[in-house]
């Protein structure tokens, strides 16, 4: 195992979490205020549920989700096109030694939660969840 990798199950450092939250607020504020002049971004409401920082704080992975979950690829492409501008704006709003490189990803937690919920409602799983009436 590398010297810089944490063992599985160990939590994120408080600094990474705090910086990730600051970057998340900055990106969300920029997008909410219409700071990026792009027709795609101006016509979509975009939520930023999470930002994950690399251990050296030089890379920020910004997870985004367009409201309604439509046009995800179009929104990611528009954000990627303006990531230099967004990086500069984040650098102005968040006081860090280095402005983090930004990459955008779709937040798939909602889709995954929906898939699990759907799976739990299947007849086979429902049958397994019912209490046995044979045990008296």
UniProtKB/Swiss-Prot annotation:
GO terms for biological process: maturation of SSU-rRNA. Keywords: Cytoplasm, Ribosome biogenesis. InterPro entries: KH_dom-like_a/b, RbfA, RbfA_dom_sf, Ribosome-bd_factorA_CS. It is found in: Cytoplasm. GO terms for molecular function: ribosomal small subunit binding. One of its GO terms (cellular component) is cytosol. One of several proteins that assist in the late maturation steps of the functional core of the 30S ribosomal subunit. Associates with free 30S ribosomal subunits (but not with 30S subunits that are part of 70S ribosomes or polysomes). Required for efficient processing of 16S rRNA. May interact with the 5'-terminal helix region of 16S rRNA. NCBIfam families: PRK00521.2-5, rbfA. Belongs to the RbfA family. Monomer. Binds 30S ribosomal subunits, but not 50S ribosomal subunits or 70S ribosomes. This is Ribosome-binding factor A. It comes from Rhodopseudomonas palustris (strain BisB5). The gene is rbfA.
């Amino acid at each position: 195992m590398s010297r810089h990798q944490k063992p599985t199950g160990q939590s994120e450092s408080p600094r990474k979490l705090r910086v990730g939250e600051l970057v998340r607020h900055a990106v969300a504020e920029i997008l909410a205020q219409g700071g990026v002049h792009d027709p795609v971004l101006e016509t979509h409401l975009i939520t930023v549920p999470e930002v994950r920082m690399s251990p050296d704080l030089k890379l920020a992975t910004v997870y985004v989700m367009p409201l309604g979950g439509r046009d995800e690829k179009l929104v990611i492409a528009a954000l990627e096109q303006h990531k230099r501008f967004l990086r500069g704006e984040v650098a102005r709003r968040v006081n860090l030694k280095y402005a983090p490189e930004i990459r955008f990803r779709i937040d798939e937690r909602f889709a995954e939660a929906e898939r699990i919920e759907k799976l739990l409602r299947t007849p086979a799983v429902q049958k397994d969840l019912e209490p046995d009436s044979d045990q008296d």
